[in-house]
Amino acid sequence: MKHVYGWLLLTPAAILLIGFTHYPAAATLLDSLFSTGTAVRPSRFVGLENYAALAADPIFWQVLGNNFWFALGTIPTSIALAMLMAIWVNDRLPARALVRMAYFTPTVLPMIAVANIWLFFYTPQIGLLDQIGAKFGVASHNWLGDPHTVLACTMAMVIWKEAGFFMIFYLAALQSLAPELEEAARIEGASRWYFFRRVTFPLLMPTTLFVLVNATINSFKLVDHLFILTKGGPDNASSLLLYYIYQVAFSFFDTAYASTLTVVLLLLLASLALLQFQLVEKRVHYR
């Protein structure tokens, strides 16, 4: 009877998981094996032709490279900044609640609103960056129109938004640590850096693994800002994989190829998550 009761408790969650996760993933995989149907030409089975087209698509490789550099720039920076902010606001400092709120505020703002705020920074001539640069005689620069700077500009905005969110997890982890550890280290004459390196950081590894996985997923799913800032330009210099999927599906109406791109994205995220668990799991628990 207990066995049946357990399955009954599990059933609602299992139905939702299958309906909103497993079934869409399986349907997407199936769609990637067919051509895009039209009113005069029905969809037909093409096997791996869509994947062959993907391998020969230069835009796919460009946006995949963009996403790689975007992840490489945003993930470690936002995690390191979040950890530093959490350590600082965990100390006894004046107006600590106000500082915490200030750090967390970007997180609760919609990405579209954040993009509009940063658009004011980057707008040529009238933007904040150019206004400050003009005070020092620096020429105006089209930050979002230059292929060499546009991706870095979007990275800075995402780091500003994401760091406060990750800070909350690190702050909760820091507050769960026993204060006796720091007291004992102080009595033994350990420096703050030594205590952080040998005690605090190892104890934060479970939180770091959680944050790392979430940051990796976010680096591939956060594309709302592109609709406001660049629309993937110039010349796909700021386009990311998920935004390219959106363009293929809803601008070019090639749903089969969009499904192929989605399958690649799912496999990529699953592989990265497994790799992170395999590499980081060994250092998660402090002995």
Q: Where do the PLM segments sit?
A:
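A structural signal for multi-pass alpha-helical bundles of membrane permease subunits
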Residues: 2-287
